[in-house]
């Protein structure tokens, strides 16, 4: 089942650092931010994590809970979290269940070879459990500030405009299809 803005998230459950279990209903009543990134300890992903870290108190003040999601294992996440002193948890989606559910697994060309990669994307879920906004294929600079702005608007009851990155960027990569 695909995720759709203004609809509830499909059922899921995942493990995060700190022994936390995250599901489609675990954070009802709170604003939930799920940001998907390709890999721990890579330049863009490190910058993005530090930007979420640096704005964490602002997100918390606005009633939002932040989770980073990647295919890395729990040990990699624990090390990455400790190294960057991240105040939020990281979800280890080693089997790519969430990545496929959210449609962030894409075919990419690296060094002339076709590989499966994660498209940097963020999903904002309202306190009612409905997907409020999504950003796909985003660029790191300025993104965290845009998410925070949307969180504050959502908290105040304002209608959210479509995300710039999602609306303005044509899809260049195709989703990877799972075998039946």
Predicted regions located by residue number:
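Chalcogenol-based redox active-site neighborhoods
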Residues: 1-180
């Amino acid at each position: 089942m695909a995720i759709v803005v203004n609809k509830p998230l499909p059922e899921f459950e995942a493990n995060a650092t700190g022994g936390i279990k995250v599901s489609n209903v675990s954070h009802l009543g709170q604003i939930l931010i799920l940001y998907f990134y390709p890999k721990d300890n890579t330049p863009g992903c490190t910058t993005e994590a530090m930007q979420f870290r640096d704005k964490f108190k602002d997100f918390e003040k606005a009633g939002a809970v932040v989770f980073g999601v990647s295919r890395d294992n729990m040990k990699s996440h624990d090390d990455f979290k400790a190294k960057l002193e991240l105040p939020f948890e990281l979800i280890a989606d080693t089997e790519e269940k969430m990545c496929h559910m959210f449609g962030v697994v894409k075919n990419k060309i690296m060094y002339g070879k076709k590989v499966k990669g994660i498209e940097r994307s963020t999903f904002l879920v309202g306190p009612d459990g409905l997907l409020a906004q999504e950003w796909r294929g985003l660029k790191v600079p300025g993104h965290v500030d845009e998410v925070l702005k949307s969180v504050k608007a959502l908290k105040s009851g304002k209608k959210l405009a479509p995300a710039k990155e999602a609306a303005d960027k044509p899809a260049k990569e195709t989703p990877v299809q799972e075998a039946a």
